[in-house]
Amino acid sequence: QLKHKITNQGVLNLGIGNNRVTVPGGFGALAKERFDRDILMQSGVKKVIIFEGINDIGAAKSGNSETVARQIIESIQGMVRKAKARKKKVYLGTITPFKGAGYYSHFHEAARLYVNDWIRSQAKKVDGILDFAKLLQDPNDDRRMKREYASNDWLHPNPAGYKAMGI
């Protein structure tokens, strides 16, 4: 689906595996801290896809899932504001299902759902919503990826999953 929206364009993918938005401890600087340098200051960037939050959810050991979700949302809002201020088109990607992953719990799932509900509510404030969660979810259990799209860790999509996402 995504490939139909951005055909014939160069793509600059500056995602970092295990990177986080709000909680230090993953690889590299927090996404919200490197957003200007890595994305907005790059020549020719016209559209930005923000697909963040799963590693922050996984890093949360306990507490209030709404608090974790609100921290992620606040960081995403900051990135959206910065991109819009620079006249970039902004697309938000929902957090994909991860039931079966090592850190999955009802607490973590509640945070994912909270963030995804917020992302979907932003359709009129951004240029598009990429509902990766809906695209990859198992129709029999929306907390889990379809087997044909899931890697063995149940957290990351496999090559077929990334292809379906247009990544």
Task: Indicate residue ranges for each PLM-predicted region.
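Catalytic His-Asp segment of secreted/periplasmic serine-dependent ester chemistry enzymes
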Residues: G58, I95-I167
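Surface-exposed amphipathic alpha-helices with a cationic face
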Residues: I76-K84
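Short Gly/charged-rich anion-binding patches and loops
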Residues: R34, G78, Y114, W118
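Conserved SGNH/GDSL esterase-like catalytic core that processes O-acyl groups on lipids
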Residues: Q1-Q77, K99-Y104
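Structural recognition of the beta-strand scaffold that forms the well-ordered cores
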Residues: Q9-G15, K46-E52, K88-T94, G128-D131, ...
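Short, well-ordered coil/turn elements that cap or connect secondary structure elements
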Residues: K5-I6, A85, A123-K124
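Extended hydrophobic-aromatic, low-complexity segments
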Residues: K47-I49, A59-K61, A83-K87, Y91-T94, ...
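Non-catalytic positions within long, well-ordered alpha-helices that form the structural scaffold/packing
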Residues: L40-M41, K84, R120
